[in-house]
Amino acid sequence: MDATSCMKSLLLAVAQYKTCKSDSNGGVLHRQLEVIIGLNLNRLFASNQILPSECLSSLIELLEDPNTSPAITLKTINLISSLAADSETGETLHATYNLTNVLAGLVHRYSSIINDPVLLQSIQLLQRLTYNVRVLHASINIEELIAFLMNRIQAPEDKLTMPCLGLMANLCRHNLSVQAHVKSLNKVKGFYRTLISFLAHTCLTVVVFALSVLASLTLNEEVGEKLFHSRNIHQTFQLIFNILVNGDGTLTRKYTVDLLMDLLKNPKIADYLTRYEHFNSCLHQVLGLLHGKDADSASKVLELLLAFCSVTSLRCILRQAVFDQAGKPGAGSGRLGPGTKSSEPAVSLVHWSSQSLEAPQNCALLALELFKEVFEDAIDAGSCQSAERFVDLLLPVILEQLQIPDHELDEALAKKRCERVAKALDVLIILCGEDVLKFRVTRILVVNRFVSMVDYQFSCSGVDTSTKMVDSEFFKTSTDVILKSLDLMSRIKQLVTNMEAAFYKILQDHRLITPLSFALTSKNRERVHAGLRILFEAAPLPGFPSLVLGESIAANNAYIQQETDCPPKRFAVQVTSNNCKTPQSSNIQSIDNSSTKMQDLILKLQTGMEIKDQANDVRISDIMDVYEQKLSALASKESRLQDLLEAKALALSQADRLIAQYRCQRAQAEAEARKLAALLKDTERRNEELSLLLKSQQIESERAKSDIEQLFQHSKKLQAVADEHEKLKISYADHLIKYELCEKQYKELQASYNLLTKQAETMKKLNDSLKVQNEQTIAQLNEVENQHKDLTKQLQDRDGKITNLQQKLKLLEEKIKTKQKEKEDMEETIDILRKELSKTEQARKELSIKASSLEVQKTQLEARLEEKEAVVKLQQEELNKHSHMIAMIHSLSGGKLNTENVNLSL
């Protein structure tokens, strides 16, 4: 079955289960859920299509229904967990379907059943959904969820403790409302004590979760100041870096990076980290994680390195670790123990920056951003020589990023490509800030690449149609690419052949007006600066359309004002120019015709004003005011009509789509009904045939039963005979085995006896030597007593020092007590071992007795065998005598029988 039919079957099964929650309906729904899980439809559910949305809504309703069976609930949670593995689907489930509150209610319902798998799966799914997501504590079931999590964390440790800690860390991170709610509870001090006790846990993931919750709740309070004080912060850093390098997996590494990034936002802790003596070795271990790790771990490590770059002194150390000390022997060795093998960090960064567009993580963007930071620091510090060899490695990767794709990309991949190109251009712009690096960059850049790239961005961003959406993220990234490309061209126009002519040609292109006006009216500071630099270059040119730029800026400002006044409405701002292409829509053509008529009226009025005398200026100005009011009214009417037309067109397209979907669904349902009717007829015909076969087989089975009973009685008799034979064989084999075992045990015991006698002799020798040593020690003790008398005098002088050391002695006494307890435990174990040794000696004695008895039995059996052999010999001799006598008798009787033919057995 295809995905569409499977989802329809799922919707039908859910509807049937809602109407009647019977076992049969539950079984059908369970099978449909397993089918959907097996198909792996994550991308289909991530789309905004109607059928997957209905399926998700029905699944959420199943979780909300308290009468849903636990088996169906668990299977539904498994399906949603597999779908939530995709980040876009997870965000949709949280934001659109309110799954977080539904799962919180589910946890509240199952909170009394601790060992239920539904509770564990729900908490794990909540942990995945709430990662890097802010949840309002005033939402439904969230306060109950927080109370449950705190109770479970403070309860004895079980399998729920770790996911509860992770979920609590997600809820408290960057969420002031949840933090305030937790701090307002009465049992928060006990909760803090429990979290602090978890810092000594053997599982590194539990330690990270507990430390993350403590950092979120207590970082700016008295408890946090004690916990992250300068006396303890170095141990905390060592613990965090240890977990980061030697963590249990990607999940632990994610939370460790988030924790360290949150701590770096505190200026005191950032200052402590700059003074941390082992930061260099820890940084090399962290850079080593970029080599040979998965994309998830690499992206989190890159985020951490970018967070280090936010601190000036740490950025300098990071630059030295990446460039200056790369490849040095021992660069990756630190105090962290068995870390990962570290290749040159810059080579690993080049590898991650060349990641493909289809990769799920944004490692390429982060790696390029990190290159930008370290290159900028190298240029500022005047140490570009260390970075030169890595520039040659990076430039081919950047050129590959700037290439135009061969095929058309979808919107998500196109936006991702634009972001990556923008980051690559940032790196090139930074490299052009130093002459040597700038020369290396200009050696590989050509004009055609920039011209084709700017043309491609003009075409794919919709600038050719002179219409843009101000709130479109793709348009913003395309604008950034165009502006940064022109900024880079302006920096290298004197060093690359034909670059200057191409640069000024693009500046005079009317398509540049839309992105330039957007940049000048943007809220982003860097975008405004880039737009101003380009404007200063373009303004003196004769072909630059400055009037159109002014109109575009005014239109953007009007749109921004309208958006601030009416934020829910989002319309497109249209900029018309004389060089624009004519649109194809009839509605837009009418609007363009009316706008041209207005332009003609304005021109006529202007020419009329030039012909008229100055005496009629007042009247003409009044007429102009009237016309301006009419023009503004017409413009507002046109915008409203355009909005209505767009809304109606959208509604009509949605209605057509719904009608088409309904017709398709109806046709598919009718086809399925026909198939089911045909299947039902076939099954009825098969049932009749099978009933006839069943009757004939019943008759044959009755005959077979009688034959089987006769054979069974005969087999019983044979089985009894076989059982007796087998018993005799088994008893004979058992006796042989026992005899062989006894012989082996006797030999082993004899060998052990010999060893024990040797050990006894050695113990006697040791005893004699110990006596001699004892006499020597007595003599030494006498000497020590004399020394002791001398030392007592010295001890009287040191009584003052002893009073200061008494506190330390108390601690040592406690340790001694623990050692004494351990000693007592060891003595108990020694007593137990002695008892076991005595038992083994008794067993040895019993075995020796058994061995002696077996030897006696053996001698008796040998004597009996000798007697029986003697008797057999005597009988044989008597038989021989009898045979001779019979032969003599036959010979005397006439020799009719030969002696050879005599039957001796008689």
Curated annotation (Swiss-Prot):
Coiled coil: 626-884
Protein's cellular compartments: Cytoplasm; Chromosome
GO biological process: chromosome organization; DNA damage response
Chain's role: Acts as an inhibitor of protein phosphatase PP2A. Together with topbp1, plays an essential role in the response to genome instability generated by the presence of acentric chromosome fragments derived from shattered chromosomes within micronuclei. The CIP2A-TOPBP1 complex tethers chromosome fragments during mitosis to ensure clustered segregation of the fragments to a single daughter cell nucleus, facilitating re-ligation with limited chromosome scattering and loss.
Family: Belongs to the CIP2A family.
Quaternary structure and partners: Homodimer. Interacts with topbp1; forming the CIP2A-TOPBP1 complex.
Protein name (record): Protein CIP2A homolog L
